[in-house]
């Protein structure tokens, strides 16, 4: 009788274990606590980011399929590239319906490729899907930076990404070149923070070769080079940027250099008042006055000088923390290996150089203090010590020190945008993805931060711009730098 009795008990045991596992999963993930973690904890952004990308894929497809495409510059881009593909290298002769070609050579090459892929520019729907891919790729790069820094709660980025009609319109309904330039820029920023300097310089120079607004990041990048690399290696990276520009512009520089430089790097170009987003309250005469333009340039330079010292301090602190990371990471890895070995049932042999791999008292104190400071900065609570005596693995998110690098870059760009002679609607992508970071770097309350982002979105969605929307946009540009 014993065997049947034993057999009858086995299924019951299995069902109990299965039920316990399911209950454990449900208790761990399907509850309010985990939902709050996903929304509020910056450390959850890698998980939330995957859902954001999937949702954005659906949103972009719906926008492309349901919202009519608006022709603004796409045909003109194709006409300008067609002239180049037909053998014209004189920039003064490359024109489209909206005027002459005013972008550097990388723009010509990229849109020439799109010219062929889209059947001489006629397959606009295919171009829209290509730009949807550009949007998703750039968003992935942006989310990677935010995940590293752990500065902004995930719900902020979710709301920011899903609620901006203007951004989706610029990418998949207008096909401007600004998204291409910004994509290359964020690729460069990721590479710089990974300390892949030459590749980062290459992408940065390519971004400048698509549109010159990327140069707004250049002052911060110069200081970042100097802080990380020193003078000689900085000169080398600047040479990389310069050589790439020469290679890109070679077909034009070797044939009609003056026309190329005058056309693609024209800093004195006059913008049309009817398209301005930020200076609607000015008369056309004042808007086009060169004294006004020089005044804005002077203000830009003064603000850059004012922020130069704190920027340098931030970058120096970033470099010091990276060096500490390089020193401690091998020891952290070794310490975790030893802890893992201690958990094994086998006898651990005596290690001759045991003390060499152990942390010193100063290093242990630094790790504890640094971890507490990072938890405090992100609003997280310290993890309570476990009741059991089993040792825990050492771990620290050193990438959070990227906060010291990202803020100066984003602030430098914001200063340039705020001092621009004119902003057109597609220029919103220049700084849109950095706005949550800038807002959450201020000491303002949650309500004020959200108000700033909402007001900026309102200003860029007001078409045509009004005196109020232009003035409000300037107000929102002043608030973050004033506190930072």
UniProtKB/Swiss-Prot annotation:
Residues 65-97, 147-171, 233, 316-403, 448-484 are lumenal. Its main location: endoplasmic reticulum. Residues 1-43, 119-125, 193-211, 255-294, 425-426 are cytoplasmic. One of its GO terms (biological process) is protein glycosylation. Pathway: Protein modification; protein glycosylation. It is an enzyme of class 2 (transferase). InterPro entries: Glycosyltransferase_ALG3 (IPR007873). It is found in: Endoplasmic reticulum membrane. It is a multi-pass membrane protein. Keywords: Developmental protein, Endoplasmic reticulum, Glycosyltransferase, Membrane, Transferase, Transmembrane, Transmembrane helix. GO terms for cellular component: endoplasmic reticulum; endoplasmic reticulum membrane. The chain crosses the membrane at residues 44-64, 98-118, 126-146, 172-192, 212-232, 234-254, 295-315, 404-424, 427-447. Belongs to the glycosyltransferase ALG3 family. Probable alpha-1,3-mannosyltransferase involved in the N-glycosylation pathway. Involved in glycosylation of the TNF receptor grnd, regulating its ligand affinity. Required for normal epithelial growth and architecture. Suppressor of JNK-dependent intestinal stem cell proliferation. In strains Harvich and Apxo, there are 2 genes which code for l(2)not/Alg3 protein. They differ in their C-terminus. This is Dolichyl-P-Man:Man5GlcNAc2-PP-dolichol alpha-1,3-mannosyltransferase l(2)not2.
């Amino acid at each position: 009788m014993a065997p049947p009795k034993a057999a009858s008990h086995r299924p019951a045991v299995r069902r109990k274990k299965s039920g316990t596992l399911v209950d454990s999963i449900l208790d761990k993930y399907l509850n309010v606590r985990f939902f709050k973690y996903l929304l509020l904890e910056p450390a959850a952004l890698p998980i939330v980011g995957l859902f954001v990308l999937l949702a954005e894929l659906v949103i972009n497809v719906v926008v492309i399929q349901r919202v009519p495409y608006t022709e603004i510059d796409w045909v003109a881009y194709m006409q300008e590239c067609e002239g180049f593909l037909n053998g014209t290298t004189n920039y003064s002769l490359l024109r489209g319906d909206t005027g002459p070609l005013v972008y550097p050579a990388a723009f010509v090459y990229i849109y020439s490729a799109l010219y062929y892929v889209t059947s001489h520019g006629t397959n606009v729907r295919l171009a829209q899907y290509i730009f949807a891919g550009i949007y998703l790729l750039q968003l992935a790069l942006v989310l990677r930076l935010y995940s590293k820094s752990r500065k902004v709660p995930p719900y902020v980025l979710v709301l920011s990404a899903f609620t901006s009609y203007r951004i989706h319109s610029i990418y998949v309904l207008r096909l401007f070149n600004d998204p291409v330039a910004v994509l290359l820029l964020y690729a460069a920023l990721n590479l710089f923070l990974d300390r892949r300097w030459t590749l980062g310089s290459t992408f940065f120079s390519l971004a400048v070769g698509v549109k010159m607004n990327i140069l707004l990041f250049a002052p911060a990048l110069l200081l970042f080079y100097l802080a990380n690399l020193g003078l000689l290696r900085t000169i080398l990276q600047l040479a990389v940027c310069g050589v790439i520009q020469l290679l890109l512009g070679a077909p034009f520089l070797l044939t009609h250099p003056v026309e190329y430089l005058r056309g693609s790097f024209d800093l004195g170009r006059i913008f049309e008042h009817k398209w301005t987003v930020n200076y609607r309250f000015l008369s056309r005469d004042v808007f086009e006055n060169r004294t006004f333009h020089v005044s804005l340039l002077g203000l830009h330079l003064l603000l850059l000088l004012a922020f130069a010292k704190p920027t340098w301090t931030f970058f120096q602190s970033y470099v010091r923390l990276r060096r500490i990371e390089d020193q401690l990471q091998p020891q952290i890895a070794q310490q975790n290996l030893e802890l893992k070995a201690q958990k094994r049932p086998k006898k651990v042999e005596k290690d001759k150089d045991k003390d060499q791999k152990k942390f010193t008292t100063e290093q242990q104190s630094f790790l504890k203090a640094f971890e507490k400071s990072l938890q405090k900065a992100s609003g997280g609570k310290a993890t309570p010590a476990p009741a059991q005596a089993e040792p825990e693995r050492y771990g620290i998110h050193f990438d959070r020190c990227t906060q010291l690098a990202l803020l100066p870059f984003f602030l430098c760009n914001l200063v340039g945008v705020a001092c621009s002679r004119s902003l057109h609607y597609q220029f919103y992508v220049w700084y849109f993805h950095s706005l949550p970071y800038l807002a959450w770097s201020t000491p303002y309350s949650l309500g004020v931060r959200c108000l700033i982002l909402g007001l900026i979105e309102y200003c860029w969605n007001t078409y045509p711009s009004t005196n109020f929307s232009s003035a409000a946009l300037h107000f929102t540009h002043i608030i973050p730098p004033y506190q930072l």
